[in-house]
Amino acid sequence: MKAEASYIRGLALAVLAACSVAPQPAPSSRPAAQPTQAPRLKPGAVTLTIIGTNDLHGALERLPLFAGFVANVRAARAADGGGVLLVDAGDMFQGTLESNLAEGADVVRAYNQLGYAAAAIGNHEFDFGPVGPRVTPASAEDDSRGALKARAAEARFPFVSANLLDRDTGARIRWPNMPASAMVEVAGVKVGIIGASTESTPYTTMPVNFEGLTIAPAGPAIAEEARRLRGAGAQVIVVTAHLGSKCKDLEHPDDPSSCDRSEELFKVIGDLPKGTVDVFVAGHTHAAMAHRISDIAVIESYSSGRAFGRVDLRLAPDGHVTGEKIHQPQVMCGELDKPVPPPAACQPGDYEGRPVVPDPAVQQIVDSALARAAVRRSEKLGVTLAKRITKSYGTESAEGNWFCDLMLAARPDAQVAVTNGGGLRADLPAGELEYGQLFEAIPFDNRFAIVELTGADLRKLVSTNLQRGGAILSWGNLAAKARCKDDRLDVAITVGGRPLSDAATYKMATSDFLASGGDGLLGRLKLPDGAIKVTDVIIRDAMADVLRQRKGTIDPDKLYAPSVRRLDYEGARPVECGAPPKAGKPRAEANE
């Protein structure tokens, strides 16, 4: 898919209207601390609004309307003498046909127009690999971070990460426009913006594209950078980080008891001295937060451009923060538990006392990207879905099962197929299936890998996944029945209807992501050299070829139903036998 976009990479960015340009940042790569500067005094109190987005995943269609919301907030702050700071918490590009064709270039163009001040570096920012059609390096000359560096060069705002390090030297990376932090001035207020990346980055992107890098603990890195920025005169510190949590209750911002404390964000905040950070814009978990945690205002706003987060800080004339209002995520169109309406059907109403109007300049950027993708998107694949085919991250699903079946049809040399719940990104709607819909369900340009392993290895993969939380493994041509016996999990497995032989050798079709260490799937098996063979065939496109040949109607109820399960286990994952784990030691879970 990346080859289809090569012709647009040399286009120059449009000249932006002055009213939408972000405050010009002063990037930092941790130079020596500067002498403390006195806060700029103002004749009166000022309101600073921080708007946070996260995990856009290429959902360009949502940005013109979002720009309308931002414009209304900017107008309100301009009227009262305050200002607006717009930041993103990462995973900007990967996920839609219109974004992936240009390796995220149109997202950068739109963000430039919107006036972002900074963006965090998410794990999926590494997905595109080198500039060009390949998602991994083909030779030593290929830069496995080439596409990411190209997007940073085009951005009028920095990509910030304080904890992304060179593995060999232990020093922070020194790539153009990718500093640890930036300092901006908004309405006379000096704001330090610090970035951070999730500790799971090495195994939640293509591992080969992350070689030579490592992630340092985010808390100490943020604290060190905050001290430097405070010393340089920052009155407010904002963290934008591709790590987060999830909270069930958004009605009580001072009560985070409904939030998942096992997620990375709580450890990071726990490592920060009191008063280090004022606002924390989170991401990665595709969930919602609007809470005050350890005196830090924390926001996260789902994913795919459905909503945005907001914090209003009130600053005294001497520059110190006197209070804040944490807003719940502002859903811009439709309802969260229903499919997103098309932009033309959105009726956002008023916000900040005036109608929300999509921004025409952002709309022009989006329309251009959509037009390039339109022909490919609308291609009919020859099959009709009798009902919606749903995905699931943590449980067996019709979509996961179907995709594994299609993988086996494309690779008849394999006996089983496996994919991960994190790779399923969208449901498939009922009706004639189009390529664009398939793309959004499986947007990653992962290639086929064939893994030779023993039946004992397969049993370990199935058993381990059942006993862990996080992403489910979906299987093709494999069924398992798991029950607790004598305080241990007994798993009976069949392949092609026959009992699994622990001593036999099987060929497993999977993705190069999982085969190369993604999600930690194969790392514990200690497979011999030569057991993994990676091809140049993109899984999604091979699946599309199978569908074009098969045609017909697909019934999701035959792929998965309570009575048609490939993974038969009691209760919910993680399956536990015997005494439950001790309190205070939550299981680690993979994230989006």
Name these PLM-found stretches.
Residues 376-396:
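Glycine-rich phosphate/diphosphate-binding loops and the adjacent beta-loop-alpha structural elements
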Residues 332-361, 369, 373-379, 527-528, ...:
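Acidic, Ser/Thr/Pro-rich beta/coil linker or hinge segments at domain junctions
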Residues 21-317, 321-322, 328-340, 392-404, ...:
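N-terminal catalytic scaffold of extracellular/periplasmic and nuclease hydrolases
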Residues 326-327, 382-383, 450-452:
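Short amphipathic
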Residues 17-18:
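C-terminal motif of bacterial Sec signal peptides marking the signal peptidase cleavage site
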Residues 200, 245, 359, 363-367:
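Feature marks short, surface-exposed loop/turn motifs that line or immediately flank catalytic pockets
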Residues 1-11:
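Bacterial N-terminal signal peptides that target proteins for export
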Residues 46-49, 59-69, 156-163, 167-168, ...:
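Feature captures C-terminal
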